């Protein structure tokens, strides 16, 4: 009889929960991040950042502090921290920190300063990191999330609310905070129910067929979790055709698959998928999904995969190992697409901000492709760890991502 990882986890969680309001179960994505961090001798947090630039002197630290506290009261996941209860991984929801949360920095190199501050965030300040870096050219607002408590979709919700609370209405009644705690628990339980449902025989048969001939992984296999690694980045911009109705994701996924297919032994492309943006609940509700078509093109197989995208990553890994597939869970390339078309940069006191993507992020996977879709333009950023990924391979991936748009004549530079 098959017993899903999610089902087994929920039984263990029920034994330690005992009705405690502050203990929450972990979703499949949260389990993955928890496992990755537990295997890291340095116990490093995977940071999900958002950067917004405003004119110098515009932002008030006091108003930002009040807005941040309101956001923390409204979204309990941001007050959460990974923990264990009776040996079972959980998310423990804490109170809003007593001391100042927002950190203000004045520096000549604001890009470097905010990354250093995000990496060196005191544990007692919680999982939600807010930094205001100033110089004579700009105010740079940096928001960092422990990825275990917040996914990419949720960052947009948090930024919208932070800016709204900054403008006014920062008070959050206790009754509202309590209601949001119940709403978060309900969202997590519904997510886990979907993941359990997506871990049945049909879903596992589908993913087993997808990974049966997948490469074992070329770069992620030999990586030491304790090593800091390196980082090199390339950027390119693509002007999307105005008449196009398709979103760029399938094209990018096919390009990433094509790039790795040219390099023997690499693992399948992985991409992030999901979220509960429409529900208005902040948390980590995404999944890491593989794309490894057999025969058909990646776009066609992707449509078939959508029926099973709720199968947790750890369940797919277990199915691959049970079938003795060469691939056993290592990742070489992860694709993330950020859709800015639905969320333009915020406007404060009538002054529009501008999203920024400063270099300096720690590379968690050998290659990370981030595509930012903003109206008629696509910005592609390819980060790789040069200590394990050869420069020629990184260049080949960048070239493969350019090819569909070069052919169509839409490369902007």
What are these regions (language model features)?
Residues 2-7, 11-32, 37-48, 260-314, ...:
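Acyl-thioester-dependent acyl-group transfer interface
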Residues 45-50, 78-84, 120-132, 171-179, ...:
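Flexible, Gly/Pro-enriched loop and linker segments at secondary-structure and domain junctions
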Residues 81-82, 162, 166-180, 210-219, ...:
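A short N-terminal helical cap/helix-turn-helix that marks the beginning
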Residues 61-72, 115-118, 155, 159-160, ...:
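Short amphipathic alpha-helical segments
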Residues 1-39, 65-108, 124-126, 178-231:
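Short amphipathic alpha-helices and their capping loops
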Residues 71-83, 245-280:
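Hydrophobic "lid/gating" helix adjacent to the active-site nucleophile
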Residues 65-143, 150-153, 160, 164-167, ...:
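Acyl-thioester-dependent condensation/acyltransferase catalytic cores
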């Amino acid at each position: 009889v098959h017993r899903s990882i999610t089902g087994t986890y929920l039984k263990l969680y029920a034994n330690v929960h005992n009705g405690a309001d502050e203990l929450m179960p972990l979703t499949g994505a949260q389990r993955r991040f928890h496992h990755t961090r537990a295997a890291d001798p340095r116990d490093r947090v995977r940071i999900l950042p958002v950067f917004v630039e405003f004119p110098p002197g515009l932002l008030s630290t006091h108003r930002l502090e009040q807005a941040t506290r309101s956001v923390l009261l409204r979204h309990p996941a941001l007050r959460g921290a990974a923990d264990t209860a009776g040996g079972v991984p959980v998310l423990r929801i804490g109170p809003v920190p007593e001391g100042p949360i927002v950190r203000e920095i004045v520096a000549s190199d604001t890009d470097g300063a905010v990354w250093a501050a995000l990496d060196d965030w005191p544990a007692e300040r919680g999982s939600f990191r807010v930094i205001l870096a100033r110089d004579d050219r700009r105010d740079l607002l940096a928001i960092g999330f422990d990825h275990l408590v917040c996914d990419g979709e949720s960052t947009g919700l948090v930024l919208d609310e932070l800016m709204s609370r900054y403008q006014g209405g920062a008070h959050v009644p206790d009754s509202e905070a309590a209601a949001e705690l119940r709403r978060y628990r309900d969202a997590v339980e519904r997510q886990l129910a979907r993941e359990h449902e997506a871990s049945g025989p049909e879903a596992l048969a589908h993913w087993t067929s997808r990974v049966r001939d997948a490469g074992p992984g070329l770069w992620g296999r030999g990586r030491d979790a304790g090593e800091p690694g390196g980082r090199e980045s390339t950027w390119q911009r693509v002007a999307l055709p105005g008449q196009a109705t398709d979103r760029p994701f399938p094209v990018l996924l096919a390009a990433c698959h094509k790039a790795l297919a040219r390099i023997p032994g690499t693992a399948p492309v992985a991409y992030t998928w999901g979220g509960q943006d429409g529900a208005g609940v902040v948390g980590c509700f995404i999944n890491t999904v593989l794309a490894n078509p057999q025969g058909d093109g990646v776009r066609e197989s992707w449509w078939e995969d959508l029926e099973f995208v709720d199968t947790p990553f750890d369940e797919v890994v277990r199915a691959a190992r049970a079938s003795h597939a060469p691939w056993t869970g290592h990742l070489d390339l992860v694709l993330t697409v950020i859709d800015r078309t639905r969320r333009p940069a915020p406007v404060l006191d009538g002054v529009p901000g501008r999203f920024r993507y400063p270099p300096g992020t720690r590379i968690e996977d050998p290659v990370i492709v981030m595509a930012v879709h903003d109206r008629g333009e696509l910005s592609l950023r390819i980060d790789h760890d040069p200590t394990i990924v050869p420069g020629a391979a990184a260049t080949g991936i960048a070239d493969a991502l350019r090819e569909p748009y070069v052919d169509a004549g839409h490369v902007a530079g």
